[in-house]
Amino acid sequence: MSAKAEHYDVIRKPIITEKATMTSENGAVVFEVAIDSNKPQIKEAVEALFGVKVKAVNTTITKGKVKRFRGQLGKRKDVKKAYVTLEAGNTIDVSTGL
């Protein structure tokens, strides 16, 4: 499967945190994805961009916090994360560029 332009719109960036590193030991990778993307779109994009087989996709939406900026109230954007579990034998090196 070849990568299309819309696949790059679905996957925004990999998330590299302590929790994401711990899940990578179990064969999962964490990505920030477009807020309007769904699980089949995420699965198709990861398989096309990285050439791996996806076993499961779990998503979470983190609501943006209300913050004060120069005396004005503002809101950070909502973030959607996708926990992508890979089939056995497949790996993704997230330290390389997309």
From Swiss-Prot:
One of its GO terms (cellular component) is ribosome. GO terms for biological process: translation. Keywords: Ribonucleoprotein, Ribosomal protein, RNA-binding, rRNA-binding. Disulfide bonds: none annotated. InterPro entries: Nucleotide-bd_a/b_plait_sf, Ribosomal_uL23-like, Ribosomal_uL23/eL15/eS24_sf. It holds the Pfam family Ribosomal_L23. One of its GO terms (molecular function) is rRNA binding. SUPFAM superfamilies: Ribosomal proteins S24e, L23 and L15e. NCBIfam families: PRK05738.1-3, PRK05738.1-5, PRK05738.2-4. One of the early assembly proteins it binds 23S rRNA. One of the proteins that surrounds the polypeptide exit tunnel on the outside of the ribosome. Forms the main docking site for trigger factor binding to the ribosome. Belongs to the universal ribosomal protein uL23 family. Part of the 50S ribosomal subunit. Contacts protein L29, and trigger factor when it is bound to the ribosome. This is Large ribosomal subunit protein uL23. It comes from Roseobacter denitrificans (strain ATCC 33942 / OCh 114). The gene is rplW.
